Amino acid sequence: MADHSKNEAAAYALKLLSLRSHSRFELAGKMLRKGYRKELVEEVLDYLVQKQLIDDEAFAKELIGSRSRRKPVGKRKMQFDLIRKGVPENIADALLKEYDGAELCYRAGVRKAAALKGRDESERKKKLEVFLRNRGFDWPVIKETITRLFQTGPECEND
């Protein structure tokens, strides 16, 4: 195992942070895989937290916002993704209290319904249900979305 200096380890962590935000857990994993000693990694990460360059709560907010805009997912899946990325469960729970899964489900449903345009209604409903379930939305929210889309005539049909 290579013997790395604190400055070298900090430079590597800062390089990773310059590319995108990371949780403390993600950075630790990448640094350990790179060959840095655990004690050195912890020391560097403590320093970066102290300097507010690593903030798991800010990272989680950024991830939630990004996913909500780009690829909406259900509350359960979002919580799973946050925890998988190393965000402490208490932070994930607190941030997801206000998570509007119904509106995100509807937005994802509108996009998918547009992609399914031209198919018969029952096939579109089934494919939409599977798509939304795979995105982690709960059945009551999926049912409401499908009803809303097909009751008013899918918005995608008017495009």
Swiss-Prot record:
GO cellular component terms given for this protein: cytoplasm
Keywords: Cytoplasm
Protein name: Regulatory protein RecX
Gene source species: Chlorobium limicola (strain DSM 245 / NBRC 103803 / 6330)
Superkingdom field: Bacteria
Localization of this protein: Cytoplasm
GO biological process: regulation of DNA repair
Gene: recX
Major localization listed first in the record, in broad terms: cytoplasm
Job description of the protein: Modulates RecA activity.
Protein family membership: Belongs to the RecX family.
Record PANTHER family: REGULATORY PROTEIN RECX FAMILY PROTEIN
Keyword Cytoplasm: yes
InterPro entries, per database record: RecX_HTH_1st, RecX_HTH_2nd, Regulatory_RecX, WH-like_DNA-bd_sf
